[in-house]
Design a protein with these regions (language model features):
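Short intrinsically disordered terminal tails
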Residues: 1-6, 72-76
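N-terminal acidic leader/helix
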Residues: 3-25
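Acidic, low-complexity, intrinsically disordered interaction modules
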Residues: 20-76
Length: 76
């Protein structure tokens, strides 16, 4: 998987802000959270790279959903 980490982080932040502004009441939110758990199992290296770049763990459901919504902008 080749994704520009800087561009991904910008998209992640946009998705996170959207979720925050809408109090997580967004179609596909629960599915995205569940999908993150599965994605993590197969793509630990990418998630770790993102966490290191960002300097913060993905520790909330909102962050997990934002990650998956951001990822949906790239073909993987």
């Amino acid at each position: 998987m080749t994704i520009n980490i800087k561009a991904f982080e910008r998209q992640f932040q946009k998705e996170y802000n959207f979720l925050y502004e809408n109090d997580n009441n967004v179609a596909g939110y629960r599915e995205a959270v569940a999908a993150f758990d599965e994605f993590l199992k197969e793509n630990k290296n990418f998630v770790c790279e993102f966490v290191q770049y960002r300097g913060d763990f993905i520790s909330s459901d909102r962050e997990a959903a934002a990650f998956m919504f951001a990822l949906s902008n790239w073909e993987v």
